[in-house]
């Protein structure tokens, strides 16, 4: 999606909040991590967060999971770049469900994609991984 198109209301809100803050406090923009967003896409918003469907897909069709994560990563980068352009002072990526993965799977299916995000964003503003 085009952040200044379909999500223009978010960027307008960022610009308005930034203006109203008058530099008193930093404004932090944010997005979910590709892994976390993918789990919501696969599992839906409810459930007990055991991620059965997602884990089944990870282990049975890892190439397809990587395709999804690549698409989501590109969207997250675009969204965060737009927030930065709208005036945020820092960016945060929330990896809420990264802990659902074993260490090796975490590196492959979550950390790898957050690394791509950090590299794409550069160092114009701080980027926080949480």
Named regions from a protein language model:
Residues 6-130:
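Active-site loop segments of alpha/beta catalytic cores
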